[in-house]
Structure formats: C-alpha cells, structure tokens
Amino acid sequence: MKTASIHFWSTLVLLFSCIGSVIAYSSTDLTTMYDWNQIIKPLEWGQMNFIHTTDTHGWLNGHLRDARYKADFGEFKSFVLRMKELADFKDVDLLLVDTGDLHDGNGLSDASDPEGIYTNNIFTYLPYDILTIGNHELYQASVSNNTHEYFVPHWNGTYLASNVQIFNSSNELEQFAAESAYFTTKHGVRVLAVGFLYDFTGNANNTVVTPVETAVNSRWYQQQINRTDVDLFLLLGHIPVRDWDEWKSLHASIRKVHPDTPIQIFGGHSHIRDFAVYDESSVSLEGGRYCETVGWLSIDGLAASNATRQYVGRPVTNETRQSYPNLPIPNTPLYYTRRYIDFNRQNFRFHTQQSEDSFDTPEGIELSKIIKQYRDDLNLSYVFGCVPKNYYMTEVSPQSDDSIFKLMTDRVLPEIITNRNRSTVPRIIISNGGGIRGSMYQGKFGPDEMFQLNPFLTNYYMYLADVPYKYAKKLYSTLNGGSNLRNINENLAALNPGYVTSDDFGEDGDDTVHTSVPSYATPNILQAQAGFNATSSPETIDVVFLNFLQSIVLKALNNMANDTLYTSSNVTQYWVRDDGYDSSPYSFAYFVQQEWSDNCD
C-alpha cells in the first residue's frame, strides 16, 4: 500500500483548533432506534449465488449513528467468510462482486491525499472475485493514477475496466485494468466477465472512456463474445440496471451470438436497490449504496453447473423486458431469487446462522481494528461542533425548517460564502442540490459528517462581478426545474423506517420489512441572497456560483441578453481563504464551528 499523506487534514484540524478549542463529546452518541425483533427473511441459495456491493463511497466503517447500517467492513468480511463456509457446506458456488465508486462520501476515503488510499487498502482484505470501475475513480487524476498503479495490480486481472484507458508515465495510452476475465467456478461453470463504465464524460484528462456502443464493436470484445467455451456471461458495470442503453447494447451483442447462454448483470451508479429482467436467462441486480445494502442473487437450473439443483426461485414470466426487442428468446429459462440485505451485524448473523459469540472471524476482527486505526490516523474523531437537531436531505420538503437545503440557503451560503473585498456588494449565491449527498444529524459534526454531507473537494465558489440585476434575478427560475414529492407511505407506522423496494419481481426483495420513508426530490438549483432584501432592486449584483455550474450560468445569462456578455475570462474565484480550505464542503465545517462549537456537552 502506498503511504497516504494526511498533511492537509492534520493542517485543517490544527487550523480549527486555533479557531476554537477541540471539542470532546459524549461516548453515548445518538443512534437511530432499531427494533431487532423485526422479521428478517431468509436467503434462498441456488446452484450459483452472488454477494454484490456497489457505490460504497468510503462508508467502510459503517454508519456509526444509524443501527440499521452500522456494520463495518470487518464485520462484512466475517459475513462473507461465513457465507463462503455455508456455500461449501451446501456444495454450491458463491461469488463476491463489486461495481465501483469506492470513495467520495466519507472521511475514511476522502481525508487522505490522494483520496481513497485507505479505503482501497481495506477493500483488498476482502476476497472479491470480480470488481469493476466507477466514475468516482476518474474525476481526479491523482486518484485514477493511484488506483491504476497500486489498487488494480492487487487483483491479478479480476479488476475490470473494459472501456477505460489511462495515460501512463510515458504519456502512452494503456488499459486502465483488464478488459475481461475468464474463470471456472468450483462447480464447473465457465464464466466470461467484463466490466464497463457508463458513457462518462466528466473524467480527468489523464483517462479516456470509450462509449459502450463503440466498445461493443471493437475487435477484442467481438473476439471474447464469440468464444464457444462460455457457460455464463457475467456483466459488471457502473451503470443503472433499468432504462440505460449501455446495458441494452451489451445484452443484445451477446444474445445475438449466444441465444441460450445465461447473461448475469450487476449494475450501480444510481444508488438504489433494483432488480430488472432482460430475458428468460438474463436478469440484473443493483445493490444500493453507502454500505446500506448487500445485494444477494441466486440462480438455479444451470445445466453447466455440477452443483445439486436446489429447486428455489422463480422463472421470468411476463415482466417487462429491459432488452431491445426482436432478440432471440433463450430456450433454457432459469430460476432466480434476490434479496437486499440491511448492512448490519444482526442481519449478517441471521443469514450466516451464527450466534453473537460465533459470528466473528479472526480476519474480520483484525480488519475492524485496522479500520479503527485508519480513523485515528486521519484524525476523524475531531469535532467542529454539535448540531442541535436533524436537518434532512429528502425526508422533508426543501422549504421546511428541518431541511438541509433551507439551512444552506438561509444561513450557510449567505454567512460563510463571502469575499472580504466585495462584502458590501449585493450578491446571489447559486449552488446545486445534487452537491448535497446526505442529511445533517443531531450530535457531533466532524470530518466524516462533512464529507458525508458534501464530498466534492473540487467544487469552488466563483463569481461574475456587477451583473445587471434584470438578468440575475431570472437565473433561479431559468436553471431550476423544481422538486416533487414521491414515495409517501404512512400506513406502516409500527415498522422501522427504511427501504421499501419495488422491482421486477415485486415487493418482497428487502430482507427486513420497513415502513417507507417520505422522500422529496432534491432541488436542481439552490439560491441564496445577501446584501439586499427581496423587495429591493439593485442595478447590479455579484453572481456567485459553483464552478460546476459555470457553463450553464454563462449560457443562461448570455441567452437572456441575446449577446455574449460573459465568457470564462470574466469568472474569478469568490470565496478565497488564506489557508486554502475554501472548496464547498468546508462551508459546512466553518458554519458548524461558528454556530455550534459550544453546543457539545
């Protein structure tokens, strides 16, 4: 493992220590109440079984204040090893797969330099059979270089990046990781695996992402799918499993050559639990996000497997297909089951049939110790302040006093995002709702919470000076599409709040029965104002915005004026701090320090 630099985080901790004393907080931390008597549905094992993780985004130490998802990756390792033991006992196959986005979202992954060093190393302690890349491995050149140089080699060809290349130290383009992998399972199933990223265009300039449709027509891919020694095609991709053309193209390219060979798909990126049908011998699974979910899928009826038929699951019947029309129909339908496992110790114990005393493995215990040591190394126990109540991301209306978006527009943006040389100039501050990735919960607020709320260290607040107000006042309505209420269900109040999943096989996929949580759409655009009130009309104002939004802000203003008033040459950074900690996530840390540093008992 490459030694991580934690200089920047240690410096920030020192900075805050100078602003105000380091805060000690009670060890009786707030946690979500959870009823362990909830009914947990058992898993059904087929001849071939899969455990799936995706979009972990650094949450490998678990959700420390939410008992529903509190298991760390050490406990997950014990779960995997116990499940491997069960698979051997049942004499069936079990594969462990992951579909990318290993960081951006938690202090454990984001407080190192480059990001992801610690979490990548934790991943190497798990016996993954196949992994693939996500878009968050490519935003920063330092991250993609480190992943390519140190993380990929550990997997000996089982980490896949079928449509991603990288410029090496000689400035020559080479494959980021293996294009494909071929192996035979314990029970004789010959598997060809590929791993694709969706048609991503936001990568740093040291990498190249080939569109899936182009890759499908490439020589190497055509050679692989025309092999005759394949019993199952395993398609991994950082691509949502529903309504995405990338999967349809990949599925069709194989089905046209192999009308009857099973195709198993695992997706990611959209952060949901989902299961979608492609045809009678091809289904797909997406296992959630943030170490909240472990995906489970079993296949039975595989003629190529020498494992005993388990007679579980159900066949594909009249479900709507995600595939392109007019493809060959397989004549060997398979039987499938799926589950979405809550990421906690109780559920892991239940599914491995272990007691509290027998569940942990020595390897899992050791990994939990390593995770704790990494947290200590990164100073993740530091506290900026203690939040007095919950501020929610999606559980309440964005206009509610309990909304993180209202806190942001009413307080954080106008009070923290300032410029000492233009503090008296009226301004609007524009941010994007998608930059907020979680809620702010009552209790201590430290590095973990900061990155969980907003992990985007490359987002800075820029501005255009002295923009005519007649144009600036129209920006919000031009850029923002609004939000809509969805998924309200208040009729199951006796159950724990959590995931209530509906997919192509129905509503019985969650391993634990929950009551649905109200969910409001995230606003596209957030806007705050400072230096003037709603009834005044200054002639000109400063327009402050995230660099992420620069192109659409410039385009909108120029369209309103029917002229090219502004180009990138007119844009400069607005929020600038002498210490350099002035990207968007730090706005919350400074606000909590300013408002609630004396709020911890």
Curated annotation (Swiss-Prot):
Instruction: Please provide, in alphabetical order, the Gene Ontology terms of the cellular component aspect for this entry.
Output: cytosol; extracellular region; nucleus
- Cytoplasm is among the record's keywords: yes
BP-aspect Gene Ontology terms: adenosine metabolic process; nucleobase-containing compound catabolic process; nucleotide catabolic process
**Record-linked Gene3D superfamilies:** 3.60.21.10, 5'-Nucleotidase, C-terminal domain
Subcellular location(s): the record lists: Cytoplasm; Nucleus
One Pfam family here: Metallophos
Q: Which UniProt keywords apply?
A: Cytoplasm, Nucleus, Signal
Disulfide connectivity for this sequence is none
Q: What is its main location?
A: cytoplasm
Q: Which residues form the signal peptide?
A: 1-24
Q: Which GO terms describe its molecular function?
A: 5'-nucleotidase activity
User: Which SUPFAM superfamilies does the protein's record reference?
Assistant: 5'-nucleotidase (syn. UDP-sugar hydrolase), C-terminal domain, Metallo-dependent phosphatases
Q: What is this protein called?
A: Uncharacterized protein PB2B2.06c
Q: Which organism is it from?
A: Schizosaccharomyces pombe (strain 972 / ATCC 24843) (Fission yeast)
What are the leading ranks of the lineage?
Eukaryota, Fungi, Dikarya, Ascomycota, Taphrinomycotina
